[in-house]
Amino acid sequence: MASEENVPFDPTSFEHIPVLLNECLEGLAIDPAGTYLDGTAGGAGHSRQIALRLDAAKGGRLISLDQDPDAVQTARARLAGLPATVVQINFRYAGQALEELGIDKINGALLDLGVSSHQLDDAARGFSYRADAPLDMRMSQQGETAADLVNTLSREDLARILRDYGEEPFAWQIAGKIEEARENAPIETTLQLADIVASAMPPAERRKNKNPSRRTFQALRIAVNHELDALEEGLDTIFEHLAPGGRLCVITFHWLEDRLVKNKFRRWATACTCPPEFPVCVCGGKAKAKLITRKPIEANTQELEENRRSRSAHLRVLEKC
């Protein structure tokens, strides 16, 4: 019998319900003759609906990116026959991908920053604290794993990651328990880590919190994949390649992402760059963009009922001047 590692990936198994789909399509204001970028293909839910609205005869084209090889296989299968090109690369390098394809400007771009249902539900990927699996958490399946971090970082560095990326109030205690546990044996699986996290919590907190490991797993995932650095760089390079009048839609799922996107959008949409203590503007600056959404768009009642993972989704839309 073939080992589980040798079983070829089946693209039809990659399930991902696109969040805020109609709102994204409206936000992009798709021109059938335009060139669009989906920086996070995932299960190609958003990508397919964008591509279906493009007219190849008029030059319409979609570039769909993902760093996850499973997502790339899925996107290629589901976008077959449509005016779409799929590239395996992190969206932080979107500019490089576009330039290699001979594309200077795009008419719109979408980033869906959520972990896909497939990644969460596939225990072997190590994202979930609900099933035992190797402690991995890598989107690209390359580089350091979560196990590498928990077994090598100092207590101080682990606590900082848990505090900064997970808002974990018991970060220091959890980091201490991790340090103690790895002295006896390496921490290699998700349930090992989940048990260690639970042991660091006061009994009252364990009773109150059904998922005491959630914040720790989020923090480690962000650290393993350098998610905030990738987002910062990706937003900059995508905005640089956006044509005047082009739209940028970003879906976030936690406050760290949303704050970064909100602040970036506000800076681009602000004309004056003078220091705040200046009584009047002397820079003569012009806004680089305008906000299409002053406040983030959230899932409606129907979508919340159909897809519980949409409950924390926030969509922000920007148009380049």
Please report, for each region that a protein language model flagged, where it lies by residue.
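S-adenosyl-L-methionine-dependent methyltransferase catalytic core, i.e., the SAM/SAH-binding region
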Residues: 1-321
